[in-house]
Amino acid sequence: MSHNTFGHLFRVTTFGESHGVAIGCVVDGCPPQLALTVEEIQRDLDRRRPGQSRFTTQRQEADQVKILSGVMETASGQVTTGAPIALLIENTDQRSKDYSEIKDKFRPGHADFTYEAKYGLRDYRGGGRSSARETATRVAAGAIARKIVPGVTVRGALVQMGPHRIDREKWDWNEIARNPFFCPDKDKAAFFESYLDGIRKSGSSIGAVIEVVAEGVPAGLGAPIYAKLDGDLAAALMSINAVKGVEIGAGFGAAELSGEDNADEMRSSSSNMGNNGPVFLSNHAGGILGGISTGQPVVARFAVKPTSSILSPRKTVDRNGADTDIFTKGRHDPCVGIRAVPVGEAMVACVLADHFLRHRGQVGPR
């Protein structure tokens, strides 16, 4: 199985399966002498960790990360050496027996059939590499990526659950840490609690839309045509389990706008442009034009489908091609979009780190 690595200069390779001994990643291309502690990585992992509320899978994984290489102690603290940084997270709460009854059946909505079609076999124990368990390693890599681009802040929020959207006039980043949904709208978070409780108790699931905003991104990251910043962001976000759509800025909403409404007008800044660039009067472009960052906040949204593992019986076929029914046991998220928030942040941080290093390598410090 190839294609377990993403990035060009900042490269991340992930490994491990949902019910294997461990999962982990190797981060290559991290500059030397960056302050890095295991506590900083753990802080991001704890935001994604399962079992923290009744609205996520009850699989109890501590997700304690170990740094195996690429850092050393100095007089000023622990820093990166420039060597590959290997990170390991042990799996401690696998229950493979939950999947023994369906090992020969293809779960609708999962990658069971496609893995079997491609490789001739699949890991039925929690989905193996196709499990969202793999995304913990991306969050760990993202914690390192956050340190590379000076002055950049990457934050995510759940802005829609099922058909229910937040009120953007009530957006408050401080609210995200106060509810289990990463929701910036206090009133909508209260609604989501009762709404998802009903879905959870029925054994069903629901989808969500996540928005990631990167502020402080310098102008000039990305390149035309085949190395567009938004192209790489879209690919990175689409690589997350259960993601079925990505948009940048106004996204598909731009199709409803006129040219006058969509184009982000500009005015001269007090610094007479220079490296700070002009002042934009709107941000329908999501901080990217021609594949290159404008200096505005980079805004991306992605849609997460409902968890395919639900308690109601479903029609399917087995490995012999016979029609059958399937009943999925195990522990699953009623809305996998909740824990996708820190994963989306991590992927955006990794892409920005990669493009920052590529930009610096091509044009030098500016």
Swiss-Prot record:
Keywords: Amino-acid biosynthesis, Aromatic amino acid biosynthesis, FAD, Flavoprotein, FMN, Lyase, NADP
Residues given in the record as NADP(+) binding sites: R48, R54
Single Gene Ontology BP annotation: amino acid biosynthetic process
Pfam families: Chorismate_synt
Alphabetical list of CDD domains matching this protein: Chorismate_synthase
Necessary cofactors: FMNH2
UniProt function note: This reaction introduces a second double bond into the aromatic ring system.
Family classification: Belongs to the chorismate synthase family.
Subunit structure, interactors included: Homotetramer.
Protein name: Chorismate synthase
Organism: Nitrobacter hamburgensis (strain DSM 10229 / NCIMB 13809 / X14)
